[in-house]
């Protein structure tokens, strides 16, 4: 805006200068015409010194005017250049402003992108920290599980060490003349079921005792099955159909146990059913139990406690179910006590299992939510390396598990062989009892002491055999229970291993996700660094442009200051020149006024001279006439003229007076001509240029008239003389 104002002011000054120059040109043209007029007037006459001075002054004024015109042209050129430069600077300013706006927008957009990247990086760092915490927690859990596995292996080794001396102790006891009460163990969903053995010492027992044994066995099996089923993970189906089926199976078990105790036959079908049930239970557990790794600590501890309680309760039940049947009243009271204690344990176990169930459900929900959250993140990861690691670890684990399974199968085969040997011993004892029972009955008929002694001896042997059989059966039961516990432990360990594998896969997926996020973060950091580099470059460019703008602004300011100084100098010079020209114009105007006064005075003098000469001529003529009239000759002449003309003398005088009137009219005409000449000269002086030639003609004509009048005057003077 300042440049535009200055340009407007310069334009105004230019217009003012142009008007002044035009006025000066007009004045100079008028002066030239006057000088030409004077030059034509004074042609042939000697020139005087003041005319030379006027010509020199006029030439100087012309030179100055030409210089002023040249300066004005240079000023116009400079003003045009300044206008062009100002336009260029305006364009550059607009261009720089557009660049500044563009760079500002870019900087703002990049600032926003940087903020977004910083937010993303902060969120990624938070995710990293959270995942690191989770990884540390999972590593801790893995270490705890490994410790538990090591403890389980140590316990298994200890159990093997304990079982081996018991086998060594029981091997030399080869007493084939004893009666045994067999026990059947049924495991549903990895459960242990104990039964009490009942030995027949006499063949002639009543049916009421058999029914009593049925009821007691069914009740004890039902209680122990509830205990063992509820000691699991708490995922049993508590429907009515299942309860009815369980009661039926328990009744069938009781009948089977009694029949086997009566018939003394090995039960192989039950073992097969047990294996099928165990496989089905393991499959159901693998399908149902999908727990998270974080919530496994409490259930594992509770499982340990329940397993210990289970083993203790089973041992107690075994020790309590295998006393010597001396008093039947004790055998009747023991199941009632067991049932009451079992109900209390069941209630406590139900409460704890409900709590565990709620905790596990919450954990399951949390695990499902976390799984849903991490599903999308676990897809885009480095699979090959992790799959190879997973295969390697799984191969190692499978090798270890296969070795453990082979050892356990060997132990199981050994135990089955022991069971078969014990079953053979029981069969022999039954045959002996069958053979000895009629002998005892027959010998009772004969009242002989020898037979009584033999019977007593045999009874003592039978008691010893039964005691040994009970010991062996208890040892077999304990071994079977240990086998079942080991199987359960192996299944639990397999489940734990599967869970650990799942956890490891999840952790690997998380690690892959973290690696992917790290890559994204590295890429984002690289892009961020690139953006920073570009921003720095653009900042440098901006600084350069700003410096250029500052330089241009300073140059513009310098140009403005120089232009203003030049304009001020030009204005001062123009003012000085104008003052000089005004002074010269005043002098020229004064000279023109003096010239007009001179012309008017000259014209007046010429007119007055002509008028004087005319009057003098008239006076001379009148004097001449008066002189002739005084003479007689004139009188005679008049009379002769009157006689010749046949006119009276009065008429002749009138005619002579008419001549005078003609002269008066001539004088009037001359006066009018003089007035017209004066008016013509005034019109020429006041009229337009050029008028020098016309004025010269008029003045020369007047001078010629004056010359003629002077010549007439001299002729009249000569005549008079």
UniProtKB/Swiss-Prot annotation:
The modification Phosphothreonine is found at residue 658. Phosphorylated directly or indirectly by NEK2. GO terms for molecular function: protein domain specific binding; protein kinase binding; protein-macromolecule adaptor activity. Residues 52-164, 345-515, 573-626 form a coiled coil. Residues 165-178, 267-284 have a biased composition (Basic and acidic residues). Residues 156-180, 259-288 are annotated as: Disordered. It comes from the Eukaryota. It is found in: Cytoplasm, Cytoskeleton, Microtubule organizing center, Centrosome, Centriole. Keywords: Coiled coil, Cytoplasm, Cytoskeleton, Phosphoprotein. This is Centlein.
